[in-house]
Amino acid sequence: MSTRRQAITLYRNLLRESEKLPAYNFRMYAVRKIRDAFRANKAIRDFAEIDRQMEAGKQNLELIRRQVIIGHLYTADKLVIENKKTLSPLDD
């Protein structure tokens, strides 16, 4: 598999796993960090550096997977911002 395809697959896997984080703040932070990291490293052309970044990404993927499991073991109430129901001023 080409390096580009591997990077895209890793990016998608990281985003998918981070969306599973139960805590809103951690979830949004993880998504933002993943996007920022991939944008920052987009211009890298050195294959050794690409390999280092890919390995770091794989380690981060495993870390996120562990955090998802831990987060589901110790769940907390959802934040108000996470509720799907829109509140109306007429609702009392």
From Swiss-Prot:
Originating species: Drosophila subobscura (Fruit fly)
What are the entry keywords?
A: Coiled coil, Mitochondrion
Q: Which residues form a coiled coil?
A: 40-68
Q: Where in the cell is it found?
A: Mitochondrion
What PANTHER family does the record tag this protein with?
LYR MOTIF-CONTAINING PROTEIN 4, PROTEIN C6ORF149
- Quote the function comment for this protein: Stabilizing factor of the core iron-sulfur cluster (ISC) assembly complex that regulates the stability and cysteine desulfurase activity of Nfs1 and participates in the [2Fe-2S] clusters assembly on the scaffolding protein IscU.
Any one cellular-component term (Gene Ontology): mitochondrion
Q: Which GO terms describe its biological process?
A: iron-sulfur cluster assembly
Self-association or partners: how does it assemble? Component of the mitochondrial core iron-sulfur cluster (ISC) assembly complex at least composed of the cysteine desulfurase Nfs1, the scaffold protein IscU, the accessory protein bcn92/Isd11/Lyrm4, and probably fh/frataxin. Interacts with Nfs1.
Q: Which family does it belong to?
A: Belongs to the complex I LYR family.
Query: InterPro entries, per this entry?
Result: Complex1_LYR_dom, Complex1_LYR_LYRM4, ISC_assembly_LYR
Protein name, UniProt field: LYR motif-containing protein 4 homolog
Does the keyword section mention Nucleotidyltransferase? no
